[in-house]
Amino acid sequence: MGKIICLIIGYLFGCILTAEIVAKANNIDVREIDPESPHRGNPGMANIMLNVGFKQGLIVLFGDSLKAILAMLICYLIFKNNYYIYGGFGCILGHNFPFYRKFNGGKGVLVTIIWFIAIMPKYFWISLLVAAIVVAISGKLNLGAVTFPIVAVPIAYKYLGIETTILVVISAILMIIRNYKDLVCIYKGKYNRVDLRKIK
């Protein structure tokens, strides 16, 4: 029951889409941002940072990180054990599938990173390093997004046990699903390289 409660707590926090709030504060509908952008309509940090502004992107970075941290912290304070893992995982689900948006939210990249930092603080950097190298070589953020949870799977299996590993596997599958359309575009050669120097 405790795990279910933490999933619910995390889900509700995850449903708070900071990018949507920031976009509305700038009189922008995040779903209508640059339809030609590889991050079109995505209520996430990358979309805001690339198409609205760097400072606004930092606000999303802070907000999405905070909601994941608070979800896990509350779960830890309530149960005093590792159920916070489910709070963080629930936050990913809420961010990706908010009920008030017809279960169509963000891609959960930042929230997943924060979750990894919490559940594997000694090893998360390995996944991020590999993902960063992939992005640096390819210029495609989506490839990095799907790389880091995939790399995290064997790490979780070795150090975190089967239960947490299953959640990490699910997070990797979700990342692939949420980035599927862009991955198809990459495969077909229709996905342009992201120039980070163009951040406003």
Question: Where are the predicted features?
Answer:
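Loop-to-transmembrane alpha-helix initiation sites
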Residues: 125, 141-149, 159-171
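Multi-pass membrane catalytic core of lipid/isoprenoid biosynthesis enzymes
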Residues: 44, 49-75
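Alpha-helical transmembrane segments in multi-pass membrane proteins
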Residues: 2, 6, 10-11, 15, ...
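Interfacial segments of multi-pass membrane proteins
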Residues: 49-52, 75-79, 94, 109-138, ...
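Cytosolic, membrane-interface loops and tails of multi-pass inner-membrane proteins
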Residues: 21-55, 184-200
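Short, non-helical or kinked segments that cap or interrupt transmembrane helices
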Residues: 31-42, 100-111, 140-151
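C-terminal ends of transmembrane helices
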Residues: 19-24, 94-103, 135-136, 180-184
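RNase H-like, Mg2+-dependent phosphodiesterase core
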Residues: 137-146, 173, 178-185, 189-200
